[in-house]
Amino acid sequence: MHELSVTQGLVDMLVEEAEKRKVKKVTKVTVVIGELTGIESESVKFYFDILTENTVAEGAELVFKIVRAQFKCTQCGNVFERSNFTFKCPVCGGQGVLIDKRGKEFYIESIEVE
């Protein structure tokens, strides 16, 4: 359910930026979502369509880029993406892993306007 508040923030930001720049129409928004955020793109799309009604972003295409999480083995230092729902290091078999650099992203990558 947190997708509603996340999407409301996204729409508020779009409308605010559009007003600042005197944009008449937002046509496309690209959003990056890390797989560890727990944010479901389908829910964001659902709320986006509702929340943008009667705004400059109404009818805008919403595109998602999903970023796979990256983990670092605490035993050998190998950086890897999780596969088959296991967090075992594919190099040494170690099970102690830390979240590395990717997977927690949530941001607007680009906005296309008329």
Curated annotation (Swiss-Prot):
<feature type="binding site">
    <location>
        <position position="73"/>
    </location>
    <ligand>
        <name>Zn(2+)</name>
    </ligand>
</feature>
<protein>
    <recommendedName>
        <fullName>Hydrogenase maturation factor HypA</fullName>
    </recommendedName>
</protein>
<dbReference type="Pfam" id="PF01155">
    <property type="entry name" value="HypA"/>
</dbReference>
<dbReference type="GO" id="GO:0008270">
    <property type="term" value="F:zinc ion binding"/>
</dbReference>
<dbReference type="InterPro" id="IPR000688">
    <property type="entry name" value="HypA/HybF"/>
</dbReference>
<feature type="binding site">
    <location>
        <position position="2"/>
    </location>
    <ligand>
        <name>Ni(2+)</name>
    </ligand>
</feature>
<dbReference type="GO" id="GO:0016151">
    <property type="term" value="F:nickel cation binding"/>
</dbReference>
<keyword id="KW-0862">Zinc</keyword>
<keyword id="KW-0533">Nickel</keyword>
<feature type="binding site">
    <location>
        <position position="89"/>
    </location>
    <ligand>
        <name>Zn(2+)</name>
    </ligand>
</feature>
<keyword id="KW-0479">Metal-binding</keyword>
<feature type="binding site">
    <location>
        <position position="92"/>
    </location>
    <ligand>
        <name>Zn(2+)</name>
    </ligand>
</feature>
<feature type="binding site">
    <location>
        <position position="76"/>
    </location>
    <ligand>
        <name>Zn(2+)</name>
    </ligand>
</feature>
<comment type="function">
    <text>Involved in the maturation of [NiFe] hydrogenases. Required for nickel insertion into the metal center of the hydrogenase.</text>
</comment>
<dbReference type="GO" id="GO:0051604">
    <property type="term" value="P:protein maturation"/>
</dbReference>
<dbReference type="GO" id="GO:0036211">
    <property type="term" value="P:protein modification process"/>
</dbReference>
<comment type="similarity">
    <text>Belongs to the HypA/HybF family.</text>
</comment>
